[in-house]
Amino acid sequence: MVFTSHKGVKRKSHHSQLSVDDVPKKIPLFKKKISQALKKASTFERQKLVRRIKNCRASEDADTLGRFEAEFEFAKQFDFTKFVDYCYYKKILKNKDFRKLLNENLHVDFPADLTEDAQRNTVARILNSKQLSDAIRNINSILEKYLRFLNPDLQELSDKKAVSSTQKPIKTIGKVDLSNKSTSNQDQVDNTHVQNSTDGVNQDTGMILDNTEDKEINKSMSYSMKNEGVKESSLQNATLINRKSIIDDEMLEIPLGKHNNTNLPALTAGFLDPVESDDEFVEKELEEVDIPKRKNRRGQRARQAIWEKKYGKGANHLIKKATEERSIREERQRKYEERQAKRAARENAFTEHQTPQKPEQLHPSWEAKRKQKMPSSAAFQGKKIVFD
C-alpha cells in the first residue's frame, strides 16, 4: 500500500459561499451594534454631566448648574435606543449600494419630540458621540467588504485606485513633431492633440502654465506676426514650442500627489445633527478633547513612604493605624472582662442555691469493719511493766 502525503495541501471549505440573500440576515446584528453604541454613549454622557455638576457647585454657578441638572435628569430617564432605526436609516441606508444590498426601503423620521434646549443638547451630543461614529464606521466597512466580495468588478476598480493613489507619477507632455514634411491637416491634428494634453496637464498638476503666462506668449506672438507677417500656422507651432520648453523644464515638473478618496467624518461615520448643530456645549466638548491627560498619580505605598519621611510618627496614616490597634485592644479587653464577670456571677449563684448534704449511712457490714479497724489504729495505752 502506497501512502501519499498531503502536506501543504489546503482543504476545501464545505461552507456554502456568501450570496446576496445572506446579507439581509445581518441587519439585526447591525442594529444591535448601534443599540450598544447608544447605550455606551448615554452612560459616558451621564458621567460627564455628573463631573460638570460638581464643578458648577464648586464654582457656585447657579445658571449653568440648573441647565446641567436638567440635562442629567433627561439623560437618566430617556431611552436612547429609540434612535436605533433612525441612525440605521440616516447613516447606512442613505447609500444606494448598501440599500440595494440589504434590500431595504425603510424611511424613518426623527422619533422624539424635543421641546426644551436641555433635551436637544443632550440628544445632539449623544448622536454625535465617538462611540456611535465608530459603530457606524465598522458597519459601513463590513458592507463594503460584502460589496467587493459579491462584485469582483468593484474589487478590481478599488485595487486600481489604490495602486494609482500609492504611486507618484510625474506627468510630461509628449514631443511634438514639427517637421516640414507634415501637412497642414496633420499640423492641426497635432496642435489640437497637444493642446488637449496640455490642458489635461494643467488641470492635473495644479495649473503649471498660469493664465498670465499664456497671455504674455499670445501678446508677444501676435506682435511679431503683425510686424513680420508671420503665418497663423507657424504662430501656432511657435506657441506650442514655447509651451513645450516651459513644461519640459525640470523646475516646473510638479509630481502629482495622492488622489485619495477622503471621506468626511460627517458623511461616513459621524452623525448630522437633527437639531441645532452650533450649540455651545458641543464646542466645549470638542475643546475638552484637546486637553492633555495628566500623569498617573503615585501608588498608596509610595505616598505613605513620602509622608513618613516628611512627618515621621505624626503622619496621618500612622496615627490612624495606632488608634485602630488601640481600639481593637480595648474592645478585646472589654469582652474578656464581661466574660469573667458572667462566669463569677454564675459560680456565686450556684453556691448560694446549693443545699447541705446529709452524711450517708453505711451498710452494717461496712460499719462493723470500720469499727474493727479503729482500735488497731489507736495509740497504745497502758502501763509498762519492767521485770527484774
Curated annotation (Swiss-Prot):
Region (Disordered): 174-206, 318-388
Any GO BP annotation: maturation of SSU-rRNA
Subcellular location per the Swiss-Prot or TrEMBL entry: Nucleus, Nucleolus
GO cellular component, one term: nucleus
Compositionally skewed regions (Polar residues) per UniProt: 179-205
Residue stretches in coiled coil: 319-349
Compositionally biased residues, Basic and acidic residues: 321-350
Keywords: Coiled coil, Nucleus
InterPro entries linked to this entry: Bud22/SRFB1, Bud22_dom
Family: Belongs to the BUD22 family.
Protein name as annotated: Protein bud22
Taxonomic lineage: Eukaryota, Fungi, Dikarya, Ascomycota, Taphrinomycotina
Gene assigned in the entry: bud22
